[in-house]
From Swiss-Prot:
Pfam families: TPR_10, TPR_12. This is Kinesin light chain 2. TPR repeats lie at residues 197-230, 239-272, 281-314, 323-356, 365-398, 447-480. It comes from the Eukaryota. The gene is Klc2. It comes from Mus musculus (Mouse). Residues 78-143 form a coiled coil. It is found in: Cytoplasm, Cytoskeleton; Lysosome membrane. GO terms for molecular function: kinesin binding. It is a peripheral membrane protein. Disruption phenotype: Mutants show a progressive hearing loss with an increase in auditory brainstem response (ABR) thresholds with age, mostly affecting low frequencies, with a sensorineural (not conductive) pathology. At one month old, there is extensive loss of outer hair cell (OHC) hair bundles. The modification Phosphoserine is found at residues 174, 178, 443, 505, 515, 574-575, 582. Keywords: Coiled coil, Cytoplasm, Cytoskeleton, Lysosome, Membrane, Microtubule, Motor protein, Phosphoprotein, Repeat, TPR repeat. GO terms for biological process: axo-dendritic transport; lysosome localization; microtubule-based movement.
Length: 599
C-alpha cells in the first residue's frame, strides 16, 4: 500500500501571506480575462448555429470563471483580514504604550498620595496642638474677663496672675494643717521638718513678701550650702531647703530653675524617705503646680495622679488632703478638655470635704462652684444652677439663720422680683427690703456665684433676676475690703501657721509656702487689734505697711526682742545669726552658723 508523503508545513509570516495573496489575485485576474475572452465567441455561436461540443466548452468556461471569481473574493477577504489584523495590532501597541504610561502615572500618584498623607498627618497634629492652645487661651480669656469685673482701683494696685488662682498652693487651700500630720510623717520614715527650717522658711516669706528677693535668695542659698556641708546632699533637710528656694524662684517667674530644684528635691526624698512618703507627694504636687503654671498640663497630670495615689495610700481615701489633691487634678484635666474626669474628681473632692469638714467649710462652697463651672462647660445648665443656689442658700443660712417665709436667700428674692415685675405697672423699682442684707455676705465664692447665676438667668429671659444678683454682687464688692483680699489678710496676719503668701505683685507678695511644711509650727504672730481684719483704703499701702511691721516683729522675735529694722542689704550671715538665736543653738567654731537637721 502506497504511503502519501505530505509536504512539510512551514509557518509563513503575515507579510509573506499578504504578498502571496496579491500574486494569486493578479494570476486569477489574468485567468479571468482569458476565460472571458474565450467565453464571448462561444456565447455568440450559441445564439446561432452551434458547433458540435461548443455548449460543453461554454459550460466548462463558465464554471471555471465562477471558481476564479470565488478565488478572487476569498483573496480580497484575506487582504481585508490582514489589514484588519494590522490595525488591531497597531491598536494593541498603542494600548500597551498607554498602559505603561498609566502605570508610571499610578506610581507617581501613589508617591504623591503618600506625601499628601504625611502632610495631612502633620496638619492634624498641628490642628490638635492649636486646639489645645485655643482651649488654653479661651480659659485665660475667661480668667481675664473675671479680672475685668474687679473694681478699677484693685486692678491698678494688685496685678493678678490668673495661674496662681488656677493652681493655688496647698497651704492656701487649707486654712489649717491636717490633723495628725506630724504623726503620719513620723510613721512613714520618721522624718519631721526641723524647727530651724520652719523659722527660716517664715523669714524667707517675710523678705519675699516685701519683694526683697536679694535677701531671701542668698539666705536660702547660704542655708542650703551649710546643710550640704554638714549633712551631705542626699538628706531630707536639703530637700526641704531646695523646695523653699524653688518656691522663691517660682515667685520670680524663674520656672526652669524652680523645676530643676524640685526635681532634685524629689530624687532626694524618694531616696531617703521612700517613694510613698507624704513629703514625696508634696514635692510631686509642687512640681505639678509649676508645670501647670507653664501650661504643661499633660506633663503635670501624671505627677498629680502619683501624688494622689501616695496620699490615698498614706492618709486614706477620705482625708481632706486627698480632696485637695483631687481638686488640683481636676484643674489639670479641665485645661485639657477632659470634662468627664473633671466632674468625677470634683464630685469626690466635694464628698470628702462635706463629710470630713462639714457643709459650712469654705472648701465645700468652693468645690461646688468649680463643679458648677464644669457643668456649664458640658451644657448642664440646670445642674449648675442647682449648685449655685445651694451655695447661696448655705451662705445665707450661715450668716442669717435658717430659711423661712421672711428670711430667704438672695436668689429667691431675685426670682420673686422677676415674677412680680409685670405686676408693677408703674415700673418703679421695688424696695430692697429684706433681701438687701444678703449683699453683706462677703465671700469671693459667693460673689462669683452671684455673677455666674445672674449670667445663667439672662439667656432664660430673667433679666430682672439677673440684675438683682449682679447688683447684690456689686454692693458686696463695695463693702470694705475686697473679700478675696480680706481672706488672705486674715490668713496672713491672724492664722500664725506659716502659710504661704502670693507672689510679690499680688495682694500679699511673696512665695507660697512649701506644701510639705504642713506640719510646721507657728510663724510670726500678729499682735494688732485682735480683730483679724483691716479697713479698706484707697490702695494697698496700708496692707504693705502691715506686712512690713509683721516682718519687723518676726525679726525682733528671732533676735530675742531687740528692735531692729531689717536692712535690704543685710548680709546672709547676719540673717542666719537671727535664726541661730531663735533656736538657741551654739555657734560652730569659726563664727559660722550651720543649719542641722533634727530628725
Amino acid at each position: 500500500m502506497a504511503t502519501m508523503v505530505l509536504p512539510r508545513e512551514e509557518k509563513l509570516s503575515q507579510d509573506e501571506i499578504v504578498l502571496g495573496t496579491k500574486a494569486v489575485i493578479q494570476g486569477l485576474e489574468t485567468l479571468r480575462g482569458e476565460h472571458r475572452a474565450l467565453l464571448a465567441p462561444l456565447a455568440s455561436h450559441e445564439a446561432g448555429e452551434a458547433e458540435p461540443g461548443s455548449q460543453e466548452r461554454c459550460l466548462l468556461l463558465r464554471r471555471s470563471l465562477e471558481a476564479i471569481e470565488l478565488g478572487l473574493g476569498e483573496a480580497q477577504v484575506i487582504l481585508a483580514l490582514s489589514s484588519h489584523l494590522g490595525a488591531v495590532e497597531s491598536e494593541k501597541q498603542k494600548l500597551r504604550a498607554q498602559v505603561r504610561r498609566l502605570v508610571q502615572e499610578n506610581q507617581w500618584l501613589r508617591e504623591e498620595l503618600a506625601g499628601t498623607q504625611q502632610k495631612l498627618q502633620r496638619s492634624e497634629q498641628a490642628v490638635a496642638q492649636l486646639e489645645e492652645e485655643k482651649q488654653h487661651l479661651l480659659f485665660m480669656s475667661q480668667i481675664r474677663k473675671l479680672d475685668e469685673m474687679l473694681p478699677q482701683e484693685e486692678k491698678g494696685d494688685v496685678p493678678k496672675d490668673s495661674l496662681d488662682d488656677l493652681f493655688p498652693n496647698e497651704d492656701e487651700q487649707s486654712p489649717a494643717p491636717s490633723p495628725g500630720g506630724g504623726d503620719v510623717a513620723a510613721q512613714h520614715g520618721g522624718y519631721e521638718i526641723p524647727a530651724r527650717l520652719r523659722t527660716l522658711h517664715n523669714l524667707v516669706i517675710q523678705y519675699a513678701s516685701q519683694g526683697r528677693y536679694e535677701v531671701a535668695v542668698p539666705l536660702c542659698k547660704q542655708a542650703l550650702e551649710d546643710l550640704e556641708k554638714t549633712s551631705g546632699h542626699d538628706h531630707p533637710d536639703v530637700a526641704t531647703m531646695l523646695n523653699i528656694l524653688a518656691l522663691v524662684y517660682r515667685d520670680q517667674n524663674k520656672y526652669k530653675d524652680a523645676a530643676h530644684l524640685l526635681n532634685d528635691a524629689l530624687a532626694i526624698r524618694e531616696k531617703t524617705l521612700g517613694k510613698d512618703h507624704p513629703a514625696v507627694a508634696a514635692t510631686l504636687n509642687n512640681l505639678a503646680v509649676l508645670y501647670g503654671k507653664r501650661g504643661k498640663y499633660k506633663e503635670a497630670e501624671p505627677l498629680c495622679k502619683r501624688a494622689l495615689e501616695i496620699r490615698e495610700k498614706v492618709l486614706g481615701k477620705f482625708h481632706p488632703d486627698v480632696a485637695k489633691q483631687l481638686s488640683n487634678l481636676a484643674l489639670l484635666c479641665q485645661n485639657q478638655g477632659k470634662a468627664e474626669e473633671v466632674e468625677y474628681y470634683y464630685r469626690r473632692a466635694l464628698e470628702i470635704y462635706a463629710t470630713r469638714l462639714g457643709p459650712d467649710d469654705p472648701n465645700v462652697a468652693k468645690t461646688k462652684n468649680n463643679l458648677a463651672s464644669c457643668y456649664l462647660k458640658q451644657g448642664k445648665y440646670q445642674d449648675a444652677e442647682t449648685l449655685y443656689k445651694e451655695i447661696l442658700t448655705r451662705a445665707h443660712e450661715k450668716e442669717f439663720g435658717s430659711v423661712n417665709g421672711e428670711n430667704k436667700p438672695i436668689w429667691m428674692h431675685a426670682e420673686e422680683r422677676e415674677e412680680s415685675k409685670d405686676k408693677r405697672r408703674d415700673r418703679r423699682p421695688m424696695e430692697y427690703g429684706s433681701w438687701y442684707k444678703a449683699c453683706k455676705v462677703d465671700s469671693p465664692t459667693v460673689n462669683t456665684t452671684l455673677r455666674t447665676l445672674g449670667a445663667l438667668y439672662r439667656p432664660e429671659g430673667k433679666l430682672e433676676a439677673a440684675h438683682t444678683l449682679e447688683d447684690c454682687a456689686s454692693r458686696s464688692r463695695k463693702q470694705g475690703l475686697d473679700p478675696a483680699s480680706q481672706t488672705k489678710v486674715v490668713e496672713l496676719l491672724k492664722d500664725g501657721s506659716g502659710r504661704g503668701h502670693r507672689r510679690g505683685s499680688r495682694d500679699v507678695a511673696g512665695p507660697q509656702s512649701e506644701s510639705d511644711l504642713e506640719e510646721s509650727g507657728p510663724a510670726a504672730e500678729w499682735s494688732g487689734d485682735g480683730s483679724g481684719s483691716l479697713r479698706r483704703s484707697g490702695s494697698f499701702g496700708k496692707l504693705r505697711d502691715a506686712l512690713r511691721r509683721s516682718s519687723e516683729m518676726l525679726v525682733r522675735k528671732l533676735q530675742g526682742g531687740g528692735p531692729q529694722e531689717p536692712n535690704s542689704r543685710m548680709k546672709r550671715a547676719s540673717s542666719l545669726n537671727f535664726l541661730n538665736k531663735s533656736v538657741e543653738e551654739p555657734v560652730q567654731p569659726g563664727g559660722r552658723v550651720f543649719l542641722t537637721a533634727a530628725l
